[in-house]
Each structure stands twice: as C-alpha cells, then as structure tokens.
A protein has these predicted regions:
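N-proximal low-complexity "stem/linker" segments adjacent to membrane-targeting elements
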Residues: 1-29
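Short loop->beta transition adjacent to catalytic acidic/histidine clusters or analogous donor-positioning motifs
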Residues: 5-8, 29-40, 48, 59-62
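Acidic helix N-cap motif at the loop->helix transition within catalytic regions
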Residues: 19-22, 47-55, 96, 100
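A conserved acidic beta->alpha catalytic loop
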Residues: 27, 42-51, 57, 68, ...
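Glycine-rich, basic loop-to-helix element that forms the pyrophosphate-binding segment
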Residues: 66-83, 104
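Conserved nucleotide-sugar donor-binding catalytic segment
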Residues: 81, 120, 135-241
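Short aromatic/hydrophobic "clamp" motif used to bind/position activated sugar donors
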Residues: 88
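Conserved donor NDP-sugar-binding/catalytic core segment of glycosyltransferases
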Residues: 100-132
Length: 264
C-alpha cells in the first residue's frame, strides 16, 4: 500500500519558547482541518522547550533537535527540505492558531490554483492589543512591499511547497528573511491575504522583531534595494543614497514599530 502524505506541512521552528510552546502546539493540533504534519525544529534551546514538546504524543508531530545552533532561517529551510505536504504553512512557538485557520486557507488555495501564497489578518495578544488587517490583493501587496506598511504576518502564511523549494529563505537577510522572500515570490505568482483574523500574534520583549529590530529594518531596506536594482530603477543613484532615502522616509516609525499599523 502506498504511503499517504499529508496535504499540509506546518513548519514550527523553536528556540527557548517554554512560556508559550504548549499553547502554540495545542492550537495547531486542535485545527478543524486535520490532514497535516507538524514539523518542529529546535535550535538548541537551553530552557524547558524540548521537554515540553516531548510531552505531546500526537503522531502528526515530527520533532527534530539540531546539534548546533544555526539560526531561524536554517531551521526553516531544513523544514522545507523534509516537508511531505503539497503546501507549507508557518507557525511560531509563541503564537496561537485559531481553530479554522488551516481549513479556510486550504479551501481558498485549492479553489484558486494561481495563488502561490496566502496570509491572514491577526489579533495582537501579550503586550499589545488590537487587530491588524493586511493588504488583500496581489497588486496591493506589491505596493506595500516598498513602504513600511505591513505586508504579511509571517506565521500566518500558507503556500505551495514547490515555491518554497524553488526559492528558500535567504540567511543573509535574517531576521528579515521573510520580507526578502516575499519580494521574490511576488515576481513568481499571485499572493494574497484573507481579510479574516485566523491567528493570535503575541508581542513580548524577547521576540526577534523587538530584540533585533534595527537589523531587521536594515535588511528589509536591502531587500528593497535588490528589487530596485533588478528593475533598473536605481541607475542614477548609489546604493548608499537609496538606503538613506528608505531609512529617512521611515524614520518616524522606527521608534515605535507598531505606530500607525494597528487597527483597533
């Protein structure tokens, strides 16, 4: 008998997530859509994350412990390389999937085969409250990539595995590896966001978007520069002039990463 592979492979890279990991995993396992595998990759956590993960006995979980701490992007690309599903879904160890997230995303993607990537709106939890709705259409998302407006919530995305296998995440741009990937994917096919909150996104002082915000911003600027170069838009300007323009344009927002982004 041929082995039946799951429709979705959920990638969950973790590092020192002991406070939230049980709730995050449970929210995935309790999805109304059940045809998935949950690939958890631990990046040498030194807290209780591993022992808490091992308490789960669900057969859909595939747990891997890296021998060396090599970073978030490396974990994601490893997960892509071993994924068995037709679709890749993302999840983080401090967030919560709402019960119908997978069902609604997979239904949309299956009905719209030209769409290669699908995100959703989010609800903030933790140290920030409110809801955030992202640009919905392919054209709106392309425009947003060149501003400081939010484009996707990384842990909400689901897309075709073949696209992730073709492109992978680029470690050079970590911790803005997701933003850089989006700039490549919009040139490959259509991307969208569902106008529905399907994930609770936790904001806390130890998350990467807070602890490494300056590096994240700089690498997002470099991603934009790469696209401008490809489009030959920057022929009369130096790299330094373009990066300075992008930084200065967005300077008012750098002191508060969520300024003007949250819709209550």
């Amino acid at each position: 008998m041929m082995k039946k592979f799951p429709l979705i492979s959920v990638l969950l890279p973790v590092y020192n997530c002991e406070k939230y990991i049980e709730e995050a995993i449970s929210s995935v396992l309790n999805q109304t859509f059940s045809d998935f595998e949950l690939i958890i990759i631990d990046d040498c956590s030194n807290d209780k994350t591993v022992s808490m993960i091992k308490r789960f006995t669900d057969s859909r979980i595939r747990f891997y412990q890296k021998e060396k701490n090599s970073g978030y992007t490396d974990s994601l690309n490893f997960g892509i390389s071993i994924a068995q599903g037709n679709y890749i879904a993302r999840m983080d160890g401090d967030d919560i999937c709402l019960p119908e997230r997978f069902a609604k995303q997979i239904e949309f993607l299956e009905k719209n085969p030209t769409i290669i990537l699908c995100g959703t709106a989010i609800k903030f939890i933790g140290s920030l409250s409110g809801n955030l709705f992202y640009p919905e259409t392919n054209e709106e998302i392309k425009i947003s990539l060149f501003s400081f407006l939010p484009t996707f919530a990384h842990p909400t995305i689901m897309g075709k595995k073949e696209i992730f296998e073709k492109y992978n995440y680029n470690k050079i741009f970590e911790p803005a590896e997701d933003y850089e990937l989006w700039t490549r994917l919009v040139q490959e096919g259509e991307v969208v966001n569902l106008n529905e909150i399907l994930l609770e996104y936790r904001v806390h002082s130890s998350q990467v978007s807070v602890t490494k915000k300056n590096i994240q911003d700089l690498n997002s600027y470099k991603s934009r520069l790469k696209i401008l170069q490809k489009l030959k838009i920057d022929s009369q300007y130096s790299k330094e002039e373009i990066i300075n323009f992008l930084v200065n344009k967005n300077l008012p927002f750098c002191f508060d990463p969520y300024k003007t982004r949250v819709l209550f």
